[in-house]
Amino acid sequence: MMPSSLPRQGGAERLRIIRIYLCTTLILLLAYGIWYAGVWPGPLGQDGYSLIANINQSAPRYTGKDPAWLLYALATYGLSQRVEVLVLPLLLLQVAALARIIGWIYVRRYPITATALLLLVACTPHVLNYGSSLYPDAVFSLAFVALLFEIWLILGHRRLSTWSIAWLAILFPAACYFKANGIIILLPMLYLAIRLKTTSRWVIVAIVLSWSAAIQWGGTVANLGHGHGALRPLILFETTNFMQTRPMNLWETRHMVTDRTKEIMHRYISQEDIDSLYDRDYWDTLWHLNQDRVRFREMSRIDFRHLRSDFFTYNLWRNIPAFTASRINIFLASALAQGGMVGPDNARHGLAGVTTLSTYNPFNLSSLPNTLNEIYETSYNWRFVLWSPFVGIILVLLVFKRALQERHLDELVISSTLLLQLGGIFLFSIAAEYRYLLAFFYAPLLLFPIRFIQQNRDPLPCQKCPRSRSTRQPVTSTP
């Protein structure tokens, strides 16, 4: 967590930096430790319940999760049969990543910004709740943002340090492979490798290739599959949307999908179930639930190939209004946290349905669990303000705009990566889950430094821009 170039600082300054990082780490450890003690072993949710149940049955691939997350779960919960063994290392990683960024900001003498990010981002009840749960979204989102932060620092100095190499190696697998949309992080990693000199470039390549090969090999050996991906759920969910019965029964709306699409879909779900089981906010009713009535899991490769072809050649274009409305609805329902939520005390009842060595509240704390529930519920009632990802989204747009105006390639790559992530979430989400947008709640940790804390900058020459606009006074900083 500490800068790599501490030896080059004066003695008093070195002590100041050490104190800042230690204090930040201790505050975060205290906050996360108290929270986890009150929710031990952590909220399960439907995904956590499925993960534990399938690992217990030696069938983790049927969770539909990505191989990297399943490998981690097998190496922790699978070997110990304890949920806390899975959660605690992730909590420590989150504390370390947050202390790294917030401490860096404080060292640059922005105490108000650092304190605001500590209180309004790092230690908010919903972040603590997701961070201690069996969902990979919190650690994935934070790792994604923290890895972009490290890339930004390295690009500012055009060199790798021991600390930066360690951070890249630690954060990369979670940021890239814990969820399918993490693959986007390969773009800034590739850009970083190109911008660095030969030796450093090969270090980046080695980190990417070694982790990628290890996860691919582990997933193959453990027969973990490839998850359900993003395209299949989208096509099935939206095709069901397009096939909803229209009460007006207008002539113009009688052929909203191809005859072949109707034939394929009706092999696996009846029209009555298409009308009754479709939920505009969730695809769970078509996949995870009602498997006696919806047999999409049994769909043959040939049928899905034909369905995919019809979707992109006719069905999508015939239903642009319905598709756009569906995308906007799910995105806004997610951003406003109007979907399902897992409370802090979820494990109280969730553990009863699975076989595990973990127990709820093993410390027999009497008031802390109830207090945390009350804090969480109060925060939830103000979620439209306190949980809003729109601050991060606005900052992404501001940084992207400035990068275009100043033709600053480094910032353009960083902000474009987040915009691609946002576009992917908008286009491919099939459930109104707030956790999908957690990366943009974390985004101010990265974007406030980029937007407001000057870093060594080397903008591309722009003949149309005044020199004073594209050149800034550098501030000495260490990665």
Cite the ranges covered by each PLM segment:
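Membrane-interface alpha helices of multi-pass inner-membrane proteins
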Residues: 164-179, 207-214
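Extracytoplasmic catalytic/substrate-binding loops of multi-pass membrane glycan-assembly enzymes
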Residues: 37-51, 60-72, 80-84, 304, ...
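Short acidic/glycine- and proline-prone juxtamembrane loop motifs at membrane-interface regions
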Residues: 129-139, 178
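Specific aromatic-rich, kink-prone transmembrane helix
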Residues: 56, 139-157, 167-172, 188-189, ...
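Membrane-interface anchor segments at the N-terminal boundary of transmembrane helices
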Residues: 81-85, 89, 323-415
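Membrane-proximal stem/loop segments at transmembrane-domain junctions that anchor or position
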Residues: 226-359
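Transmembrane-helix motifs of polytopic, lipid-linked glycan transferases
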Residues: 88-108, 142, 146, 150
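Loop-to-helix entry region of an early transmembrane alpha helix in multi-pass inner-membrane enzymes
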Residues: 67-71, 79-99, 130
